[in-house]
Amino acid sequence: MRFFRVYGMSIVLSLAVLYVSIIRTVPEFPDLQFRWMDKVAHFIMYFVLSGVVCFELYRQRYDFSDRQMRLWGLIYPIVYGGVIELLQENFFPPRTGDWSDWVADALGSVAAYFLAKNLLPKYVKPEDQGLSCR
């Protein structure tokens, strides 16, 4: 149960991204439409997902030189985005997979990872060892 309390936001965001990615219709906001809006939305979703994963791992004393941080904070969101694009293409009509969406996902994840790598050590204090979920 402690795992869900510590990493709950990462889990909730992962499920929210999946849900938004597979629902049949996505609400449109005509006043906010512009040419690359879809790509910007993908970038932001995965930027937030990767940033939150990095934050929760860092709070549990995972350093950015740690393999687990790279795996879950960077690789997981990128692979997750690719898997969702494949699922959209093959199992959730009328949704379609788009590799340029996946590139936007990956760029958002990479941007968040490197921003977190530079900002978290300066502004966020890891939890005490006794509270760690490691």
Where are the language model's segments positioned?
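Bulky hydrophobic segments
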Residues: M1-R134
